[in-house]
């Protein structure tokens, strides 16, 4: 009997990670439908998986960045400027797509939702101030709180100071970096179990009925994100590399977007993205910096969410929006999206700031935010999948760009 069970198990283990994840998703849906009580219990697997990823991500980023910079020698190629340019262009284009889609498919909301909890930021100045303070955070505090801006700053500073270190010191640094990378690989191997728990728990807790009331709004948001992922981003990559972008696009969606969709955390997906960059044979000096930086500032999905929900509010209230103001919203949404990682509640709590451009009162804006929280199960998951997979996509595009 045990031999009979062992044979399918061995066959399952021989499958690649992506097929295993697909099986985990299917099993999660099945358990949630057939046995909801059990689905609530296995949600613990998902919580453990996310906690493990979040636990290993800060120390991984710190050691990889410090080691990469300490080992860097003059003349070695890096593409950080190119990656940053692609991040900015990608976020602006995503906001523009969202604005155009909102004009083509206007959405009306029933603003009768309960007040959302949380305190929105006062404006872009406050967001930039918070980012600046994060840069000079205490290094221990940055590691404890997963402040990746602060972690990057300290890792880059220490890495530059260690460039003149002895060979023995560099060997020790590389050994620590390799050890943490090995732990990350073990955690990622548990992704099918973790995603099985996340899918089962989410469907058992929320179901899909709550989403049906706001199906049109959700369709516009998800449609924009799919358009950005499958049309806009490939066009940007083609212009950068002059090659067919779709093999790279689909590799990033398979390797990054699936796990990001279910973890709903760009920070938790950093180890997954690092491993994907390694498989794509990208330069470690580039991706060890660009991936954690992208998890903080590359937020195309957030720009889509802010733009679509803000314009849905203006349409509901009968506020006319001219083209110039719409372009201003694109810029504001893009800048605000860069600060999403430092705001509790993410992109949704940045909506009042964007809504203030159109004279919408904070009370009404927070009711709109409450609607956003209703659809956040799908909206936040799709947003994170787009954000995180784009980090790898643009890093790869910059590394492969023709010069």
Curated annotation (Swiss-Prot):
Transmembrane segments: 15-35, 49-69, 85-105, 142-162, 183-203, 218-238, 246-268, 289-309, 317-337, 362-382
Catalytic reaction(s) noted: L-serine(in) + Na(+)(in) = L-serine(out) + Na(+)(out); L-threonine(in) + Na(+)(in) = L-threonine(out) + Na(+)(out)
Pfam families reported in the protein's UniProt record: SDF (PF00375)
Localization terms from the record: Cell inner membrane
Domain of life: Bacteria
GO biological processes: serine transport; threonine transport
Entries under SUPFAM superfamilies matching the protein: Proton glutamate symport protein
InterPro entries the record matches: Na-dicarboxylate_symporter, Na:dicarbo_symporter_sf, Ser_Thr_transp_SstT
Main location: membrane
GO molecular function: neutral L-amino acid:sodium symporter activity
Keywords in alphabetical order: Amino-acid transport, Cell inner membrane, Cell membrane, Membrane, Symport, Transmembrane, Transmembrane helix, Transport
Gene3D superfamilies (alphabetical): Sodium:dicarboxylate symporter
UniProt topology in membrane: Multi-pass membrane protein
Gene Ontology CC: plasma membrane
Family according to the record: Belongs to the dicarboxylate/amino acid:cation symporter (DAACS) (TC 2.A.23) family.
Function: Involved in the import of serine and threonine into the cell, with the concomitant import of sodium (symport system).
Protein name (Swiss-Prot/TrEMBL): Serine/threonine transporter SstT
Gene that this sequence comes from: sstT
């Amino acid at each position: 009997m045990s031999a009979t069970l062992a044979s399918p198990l061995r066959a399952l283990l021989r499958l690649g990670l992506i097929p295993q994840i697909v099986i985990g998703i299917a099993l999660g849906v099945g358990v949630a439908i057939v046995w909801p009580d059990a689905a609530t219990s296995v949600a613990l697997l998902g919580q453990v998986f996310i906690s493990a990823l979040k636990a290993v991500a800060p120390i991984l980023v710190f050691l990889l960045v410090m080691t990469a910079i300490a080992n860097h020698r003059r003349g070695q190629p890096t593409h950080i400027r190119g990656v940053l340019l692609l991040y900015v262009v990608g976020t602006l284009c995503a906001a523009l797509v969202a604005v155009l889609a909102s004009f083509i498919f206007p959405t009306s909301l029933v603003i009768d939702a309960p007040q959302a909890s949380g305190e929105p930021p006062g404006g872009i100045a406050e967001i930039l101030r918070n980012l600046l303070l994060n840069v000079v955070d205490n290094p221990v505090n940055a590691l404890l709180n997963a402040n990746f801006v602060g972690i990057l700053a300290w890792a880059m500073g220490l890495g530059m100071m260690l460039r003149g270190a002895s060979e023995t010191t560099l060997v020790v640094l590389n050994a620590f970096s390799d050890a943490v990378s090995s732990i990350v690989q073990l955690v990622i191997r548990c992704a099918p179990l973790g995603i099985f728990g996340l899918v089962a728990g989410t469907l058992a807790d929320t179901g899909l009925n709550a989403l049906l009331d706001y199906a049109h709004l959700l369709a516009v948001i998800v449609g924009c994100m799919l358009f950005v992922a499958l049309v806009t981003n490939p066009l940007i990559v083609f212009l950068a590399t002059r090659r067919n972008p779709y093999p790279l696009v689909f590799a990033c969606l398979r390797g990054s977007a699936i796990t990001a969709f279910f973890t709903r955390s760009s920070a938790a997906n950093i180890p997954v993205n690092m491993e994907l960059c390694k498989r794509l044979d990208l330069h470690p000096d580039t991706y060890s910096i660009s991936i954690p930086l992208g998890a903080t500032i590359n937020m195309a999905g957030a720009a889509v969410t802010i733009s679509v929900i803000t314009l849905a509010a203006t349409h509901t209230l009968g506020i006319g929006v001219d083209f110039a103001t719409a372009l201003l919203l694109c810029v504001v949404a893009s800048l605000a999206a860069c600060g999403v990682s430092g705001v509790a509640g993410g992109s949704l709590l940045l909506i009042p700031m964007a809504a203030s451009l159109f004279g919408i009162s904070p009370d009404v804006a927070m009711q709109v935010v409450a609607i956003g929280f209703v659809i956040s199960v799908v909206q936040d998951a799709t947003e994170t999948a787009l954000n995180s997979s784009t980090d790898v996509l643009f890093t790869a595009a910059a590394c492969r760009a023709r010069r």
